[in-house]
């Protein structure tokens, strides 16, 4: 056990030992101890007050007092008063700190604080944070607050039953709060709203609404029972800052950074996932709200990805295949702590076409230029299954659900009907394409972009559901 010595105090101990000794029995929590009250009263004002001699007719030299201190901490303080030495380790330091604060023994107070700060541990958090607030120990409070903020995902369940409004506010408003995104704070509150009481005000005081997803904003409106959310222009928290993004940065610059990324969208939010950055495949992702013109943080994926595909389903965002792990799949959505690995694909696939019908995810193509296999994953299932094969291979095609049918279009075109579990051929596009996109505009299915024989296709085609064919779109 480490020993700490107060050399200045040690010089005075010899003189104190020559003084008249008065014995006092101290009843503490967990036991009692007989002390030389003369020495102990010299230690601090607390002991001078609580060990005051109560003379009787018999002038009894032994008195008895009761102190609200645990016997182990009191024993350490008594030993220090006799020797100038205090014994501190990780097991006794927190209780000893509280006892030394109550007894006003400054050397032990600052020695305990320095010991705690040098090797701060999770088990110190609650007591140290409460002592920091209660006794105004700013360095202990600041260090503990930052520790809790940085380890928030590990400590969130431990602190909720111990901290009051002020304690939670200091933590949740911190730049150091380690959360994957701002939606996580809202989700954390909703899960505990029955316990939090007046912490409803925290939502207004600590949430950085400019980094919330639309779902997070709607949750705030629901919590506050309002139709318009408060304005916020705070900087992002350190945990979800992107080291390669300067602040502020416009949306076009952010999009340029995510070169060769996978993209998909949910409503007005476009998700940019993986790609090529600094001459390597990376695992970063970001969301861009093109209506409010702000970016929304996404935690890094478990795997770097290039030539992957993304699809929203089951209130989650799924990322499928791509290099360097072409069978891997993972999912995430705003408010989740991290991406979750999902069952692997049955075949390795890069740039596969993906779509979702009734929360069933379908994956087509991306394996080889001759492959016609398809796979699907049912909600809450732990294994992909092969579906009906397509008529044509769709190595670089795209997919979209339109009118309850799953359209698969590239150099060739066909659609899948879930009710009959069959594919149906339709006319090929007028201009065959690799890596095009299907979009819906004014209830019309449009085919845009793509390449063919190294040339970009700038003609837009519209699907005619009466003739099962494609026409050049005139914008009407």
From Swiss-Prot:
Stretches assigned to the BACK domain: 125-218
Any Pfam family hit: Kelch_1
Transmembrane spans: none
Inducers of expression: Expressed in the early phase of the viral replicative cycle.
Domain BTB span(s) in chain numbering: 10-90
Residue spans of the Kelch repeats: 269-315, 316-359, 361-404, 406-443, 444-476
Keywords assigned: Kelch repeat, Repeat
SMART domains, per the entry: Kelch (SM00612)
Function: Might have a role in the suppression of host immune response.
Similarity comment: Belongs to the orthopoxvirus OPG047 family.
Record-given protein name: Immune evasion protein OPG047
Organism: Vaccinia virus (strain Ankara)
């Amino acid at each position: 056990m480490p020993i700490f010595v107060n050399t200045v105090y040690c010089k005075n101990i010899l003189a104190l030992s020559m003084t008249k000794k008065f014995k006092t029995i101290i009843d503490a929590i967990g036991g009692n101890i007989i002390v030389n009250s003369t020495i102990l009263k010299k230690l601090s004002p607390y002991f001078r007050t609580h060990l005051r001699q109560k003379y009787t007719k018999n002038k009894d030299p032994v008195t008895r007092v009761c102190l609200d201190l645990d016997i182990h901490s009191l024993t350490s303080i008594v030993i220090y008063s006799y020797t100038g030495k205090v014994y501190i380790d990780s097991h006794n330091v927190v209780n000893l700190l509280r006892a030394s604060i109550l007894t006003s023994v400054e050397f032990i107070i600052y020695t305990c604080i320095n010991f705690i700060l040098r090797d701060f541990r999770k088990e110190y958090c609650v007591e140290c944070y409460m002592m920091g607030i209660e006794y105004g120990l700013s360095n202990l409070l600041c260090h503990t607050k930052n520790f809790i903020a940085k380890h928030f995902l590990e400590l969130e369940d431990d602190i909720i039953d111990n901290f009051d409004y002020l304690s939670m506010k200091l933590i949740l408003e911190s730049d150091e709060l380690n959360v994957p995104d701002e939606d996580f704070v809202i989700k954390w509150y909703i899960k505990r709203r029955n316990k939090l009481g007046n912490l409803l005000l925290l939502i207004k005081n600590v949430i950085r609404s400019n980094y919330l997803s639309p779902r997070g904003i709607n949750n705030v409106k629901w919590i506050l029972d309002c139709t318009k959310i408060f304005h916020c222009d705070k900087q992002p928290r350190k945990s979800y800052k992107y080291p390669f993004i300067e602040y502020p940065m416009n949306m076009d610059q952010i999009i340029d950074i995510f070169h060769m990324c996978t993209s998909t969208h949910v409503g007005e939010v476009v998700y940019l996932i993986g790609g090529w950055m600094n001459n390597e495949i990376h695992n970063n992702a970001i969301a861009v709200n093109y209506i409010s013109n702000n970016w929304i943080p996404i935690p890094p994926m478990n795997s770097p990805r290039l030539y992957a595909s993304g699809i929203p389903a089951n209130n989650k965002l799924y990322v499928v295949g791509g290099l360097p792990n072409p069978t891997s799949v993972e999912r995430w959505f705003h408010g989740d702590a991290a991406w979750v690995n999902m069952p692997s694909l049955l075949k390795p696939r890069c740039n596969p076409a993906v779509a979702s019908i009734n929360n069933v995810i379908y994956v087509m193509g991306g394996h080889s230029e001759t492959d016609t296999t398809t796979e699907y994953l049912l909600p809450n299932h732990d294994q992909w299954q092969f579906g009906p094969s397509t008529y044509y291979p769709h190595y670089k095609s795209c997919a979209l659900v339109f009118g309850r049918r799953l359209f698969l279009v590239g150099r060739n075109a066909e659609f899948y009907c879930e009710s009959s579990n069959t594919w149906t051929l339709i006319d090929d596009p007028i201009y065959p394409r690799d890596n095009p996109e299907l979009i819906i505009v004014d209830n019309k299915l449009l085919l845009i972009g793509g390449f063919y024989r190294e040339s970009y296709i700038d003609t837009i085609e519209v699907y005619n559901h009466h003739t099962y064919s494609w026409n050049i779109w005139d914008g009407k």
